[in-house]
Amino acid sequence: MMDLFNQRSVTFDEPIEMLYACHDKVRRFCGQLDNLHSYLVKDGCNEMVLQNIRQISQYFNVAAPLHHLDEEADFFPLLLQYAPHTKSHIDELEAQHQQLHNIWSALSEEFSCLQNNLSYLPDADVLNRFTSAYARHLQLEENLFEIGKQSIPTEELTRIGQLMAARRKT
């Protein structure tokens, strides 16, 4: 099939690239969230805003927890095996996963308020805490992805890619 955008598809055969692809989605969603408050002040809530909120909610309620599980159950243990010096960073990232979940809960509440009252203005501080926390998190995590690319044998990456794919089939 022709790729009009000259982008290669990423599969679980390349699990680190798949993790990067998830991060690209997070960055896109965080970009939307960075603009949400000012958009609502200027233009108010409309169907486009509600659709974006539904997409963002779907991602952070379903895909993000799976992504964190991919890292915690598969990638991080393997990285520790081949690059034990990353342990303190992994510990920090796992703690951040819980913090991100907690901030997401607060943001999800803000979304619920907006969906129930279209004139509601979500708390800008909650939006900013969420996007700022993810920006810091992604940077630290991607440093470990690069170490993983250099340290983890291809066969092991293939194995965790299969585990990640299987997790989504259940």
List the model feature ranges, each with a label.
Residues 1-170:
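Small-residue-biased structural context
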